[in-house]
Amino acid sequence: MVFTGFYEHTIDAKNRLAIPSDIRKQLTAEANRRASDGDCDGTVVVYVTPDPKTNALMIWPEARFAELAKMLDQSPRSLAEVLPFERTMFPLTARSEMDKQGRIRLSDFHLKQLVKLDSDVAVIGVNDHLEVWSRDAWMANLTQTLEQSPHLLMHPREALRNEPDPGSPGSQDKPQPGDPTSN
């Protein structure tokens, strides 16, 4: 599952967040597929983890969170290296089931103590998970990122080639496609 997009939402007085409808459809379809395979009962389950660096919450689909946990189990790192991370991440992670209205419940602990979100939030798709930011913080972060790194909006194929932006320092050393001197 790939999550994309930016959605402005509100966390209600009962700490419920409505999952954006197109993402809800993806999560429901995945839960139904897993139910038909006998892997679950069809309930949409997500795992909510804090990201104190950004003051955001990360929302992981159940299957992806299980994959991440399995990767930790299979990590070549020693138990002494992995265990402190596990002792922090897993206790601070909350399991949440999506209700019939497409909402998940967020804990007071996450909202008030770990990331301090108010009711106006931005839900953003970040490839394999969602993030929930304060709306103002997300917009400020986006503006700052685009001002400092405009090359992030390059075509995905260009980004995958890891080529420097034609306007970036050092790019003049290398002929650019279409440049008559590149023959």
Positions of the model-derived regions?
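Flexible "stalk/tail and boundary" regions
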Residues: M1-H9, A13, I23-Q101, D108-N183
